Design a protein with these regions (language model features):
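Conserved active-site "lid/cap" helical segment
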Residues: 1-56, 60-70, 74, 160-172, ...
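Acidic, glycine-rich active-site loops and adjacent beta-strand->loop/helix elements
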Residues: 10-13, 54-58, 87-91, 115-124
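N-terminal extracellular/periplasmic Venus flytrap/periplasmic-binding protein-like
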Residues: 10-12, 22-32, 40, 174-266
Length: 275
């Protein structure tokens, strides 16, 4: 039986909704992080024959080609296998599993796995235009919100959080306390530079010139119980889930370079982890 090892693990900094990464389409962002992950692994990109990319939200014309465009931009061969998977919140994890399975089955010696999502670029869909909206207003569906909405009528994922809070007896104060601790830990780790080694710096073109984006912008330093207590429920009257204690809407990418352990050892490559 083959063993699968991780040769590199690289991510972008996390961009907040409509923040620094909002101007990059997923295929471009994925390509930048792909390329850095491959460079750090020490593997020739032409040797990597398999890639799986987790991606959910429709964005623009190259949405369906996010895996192929990312791999080509990273220097992989046109002969390589590249496909996207949508398992909603677990898409990136499924991508890692799928790439690892390809190695275990002998379909590849080296593979990429991870995901990219730019929620800020979620498309608005207008189904009526296909057959011709002949007169009057027509509906525009927010694809980003649609992905966050239960397809069987329960509602937004925020309602799922409300239902779980009731089911497990999790109070508003407990949720706020967890959020404060999470924000403060993130802020402390950023201040101490603990994430620098895992982040691929991204050069962004702006009106003021090139700007290097290499620090998570979503965490809010200085968050307190007092500030969170002032926030109103976001999804349900008299609910407990707010914009301050709920999961954030953000943008980013993260990828592993995976390898068969025996092949990596023969090539003199040192793994950082084992699956």
């Amino acid at each position: 039986k083959r063993e699968v090892v991780v040769l590199s693990a690289v991510r972008s900094a996390v961009g907040t909704f409509n923040g620094a990464l909002a101007g990059m389409e997923p295929a471009e962002l994925g390509g930048v992080v792909f390329k850095e992950a491959i460079a750090r692994s020490g593997v020739d990109p032409k040797q990597i024959s398999f890639a799986t990319v987790g991606n959910c939200i429709p964005t623009e014309s190259r949405y369906a080609y996010v895996a192929r465009v990312s791999t080509i931009q990273a220097g992989m061969s046109m002969d390589s296998v590249a496909f996207a998977v949508n398992r909603l919140c677990g898409s990136s994890q499924q991508a890692v599993v799928s790439s690892a399975q390809a190695i275990l089955l002998g379909d590849a010696d080296f593979a990429l796995g991870g995901g990219v999502e730019v929620m800020s670029r979620g498309a608005y869909l207008m189904p009526a235009l296909r057959s011709g909206a002949r007169m009057g207003d027509t509906q525009a569906i927010d694809a980003m919100v649609a992905v966050l909405t239960d397809p069987f009528g329960v509602g937004h994922m925020g309602i799922t959080a409300e239902n779980l809070a009731v089911k497990h007896g999790i109070s508003r104060e407990q949720q706020d306390a967890f959020a404060v601790e999470s924000q403060n830990r993130a802020a402390k780790a950023i201040a101490e530079g603990r994430f620098k080694s895992q982040i691929a710096p991204i050069t962004l073109k702006t009106r003021k010139g090139d700007v290097v984006f290499d620090t998570d912008e979503h965490p809010r330093a200085g968050t307190t119980m007092e500030t969170l207590a002032k926030m109103k429920p976001a999804f349900k009257k008299d609910g407990t889930v707010t914009a301050g204690n709920a999961s954030g809407i953000n943008d980013g990418a993260a990828f592993f370079v995976l390898a068969a352990a025996d092949v990596a050892a023969k090539a003199g490559q040192k793994p950082i982890a084992r699956l």
